[in-house]
Amino acid sequence: MERHVRLFLNKLSFASIAIASLILLLLFLQTPQTCIPPNSPPKPHLKFPKSSCDSTPRQILSVDKKNKRLWSTKHWQNNLSSFLNFFHALRDLGLLHNHTKVLCVSAGAGHEVMALSQMGVLDVTGVELVDSPPLVTRADPHNLPFFDHAFDLAFSAHLAEALFPSRFVSEMERTVRPFGSCVVVVEECGDDEVREIVGLFTKSRFVNSVNVTLTGLKMTRILMKRVSSR
């Protein structure tokens, strides 16, 4: 009896080995799906990729194409129009001319830079922690890479987001020439908050504060005039 069992197990083992060898041989001879040549017939019945070769390659857009797509959106155009209106008011005050050298600090994606350029301002520099070429270059607003008195006007709509507001303002003042202007826009605030912000400026005198609407938000524009050459 035991002899018959051993014979049966031996036959079963041989059969298993034969089947496994046949499967391995078939797998070895079969062309892998990842190596299917590009001229192979299409497979319309396949709705989902089964391999990296079946998947559709993702199109890589150039920076120019990405920018054109971004700049054509309604959101971008609305914000751009808002900044244009804002800067036209500064031009009416005599603060902006075509040859005014303007620095936009924490310029984000660059709405203000584009607005100023469209107005005809020839020398506009936008900086942000993350660059957005070609409008905005990378720089730390708390440590601006510019010489003293390099600009006629410095603007920022993001003072409230600065990690160190006093340092942020100090760098704006440093880069503006004597009798130049610093303009900041903050969330709409009262006289006490305005005085607190004005107190951050140690080389400029307060000119005025005006409530404005910018990018659909109620804001307060604070205008400072640089007076010290220090």
Which ranges hold each PLM region?
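Short catalytic micro-motifs in class I SAM-dependent methyltransferases
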Residues: F155-L159
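Class I SAM-dependent methyltransferase SAM/SAH-binding core
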Residues: H99-L144
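A short acidic, Gly/Pro-enriched loop at the edge of an enzyme's catalytic core
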Residues: T137-A154, R167
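Core SAM-dependent methyltransferase catalytic element
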Residues: G199-R230
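Class I SAM-dependent methyltransferase Rossmann-like catalytic core
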Residues: M1-H99
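Short, aromatic/basic amphipathic alpha-helical patches
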Residues: E112-G120, V194-S204
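A short glycine-rich, Lys/Arg-flanked "PGG" loop and its adjoining helix->strand segment in the class I
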Residues: F164-C182
